[in-house]
Amino acid sequence: MKITKYRTKKSLGQCFILDPAIAEKIVSYAGCLEQYNVIEVGPGLGIMTQSILNKEVRRLTAIEKDRRLSNIHSKLKEAHAEYDCIFEDILDVNIEQLLSQSPLKMISNLPYNISVILLLKLLPYIHRFEKLILMFQKEVADRIVAQPNTKSYSILSILVQLLCDVRKVEDFPPEIFSPSPKVYSSVIEITPLLSPRFSVDNSYFAQVLKKLFHCRRKTIRNSLKSCIKDADALFIGCNIDPNARAESLTIEQLCSLTNALKARNINII
């Protein structure tokens, strides 16, 4: 199937990699695949899919929303018994069932319009993967790997890095895609930890982060003054400057603050 015969859908965030050499380079970052079950989200025209299959993967499961691509993936399935393509919206898929077989790796050029939503959906199960090699819009990738005291440091940075080691592998120009997006893209290597870096109640942690980063230029004292009256003593007990802003706090400090707030049964509103 030629790209000229296929009309991409902007609503699906479709930006296809057409050069097999680029696809092979991205797949190479995942390392050996011979004994692995691999997940690919948004296989599109199957260029990356073929590169993964060339690595003698144990099992490759792709999830594709666009049923117009079924002919391509039916042919790949006929040629490779280890391949299967599920035509469904990944956001509607039972993630626990999808990730039931180990060991697991994930390699994907993620649709831009769902990349963050999908990553957050995967986080509760992220420990099941040995490694994820994912293509994001560069701005999103920068947020994932960002450190404190940087413009890109955000809730996304914190939630992902609490559970994983992250590394930006390479930036790619718009020209490698069809259609070409208006921005650069980046490949991120995500290596899940065996356990979180710090112990914290995930649901409560998310509430605290949302409160602190809602107005990121506010001091943490001002951000939490509606929730707790003697906040300064609590901050000092956590070795945190009450005049600091959320964007300057490390993940360890944020977890310590969250645990202290929870210990006092503070309702975050």
Curated annotation (Swiss-Prot):
It is an enzyme of class 2 (transferase). The gene is rsmA. Belongs to the class I-like SAM-binding methyltransferase superfamily. rRNA adenine N(6)-methyltransferase family. RsmA subfamily. This is Ribosomal RNA small subunit methyltransferase A. Its EC number is 2.1.1.182. Pfam families: RrnaAD. S-adenosyl-L-methionine binds at residues 17, 42, 64, 89, 109. It catalyses: adenosine(1518)/adenosine(1519) in 16S rRNA + 4 S-adenosyl-L-methionine = N(6)-dimethyladenosine(1518)/N(6)-dimethyladenosine(1519) in 16S rRNA + 4 S-adenosyl-L-homocysteine + 4 H(+). Its main location: cytoplasm. HAMAP family: 16SrRNA_methyltr_A (MF_00607). Keywords: Cytoplasm, Methyltransferase, RNA-binding, rRNA processing, S-adenosyl-L-methionine, Transferase. GO terms for cellular component: cytoplasm. It comes from Anaplasma phagocytophilum (strain HZ). PROSITE patterns: RRNA_A_DIMETH, SAM_RNA_A_N6_MT. Specifically dimethylates two adjacent adenosines (A1518 and A1519) in the loop of a conserved hairpin near the 3'-end of 16S rRNA in the 30S particle. May play a critical role in biogenesis of 30S subunits. GO terms for molecular function: 16S rRNA (adenine(1518)-N(6)/adenine(1519)-N(6))-dimethyltransferase activity; RNA binding. InterPro entries: KsgA/Erm, rRNA_Ade_diMease-like_C, rRNA_Ade_Mease_Trfase_CS, rRNA_Ade_methylase_Trfase_N, rRNA_adenine_dimethylase, SAM-dependent_MTases_sf.
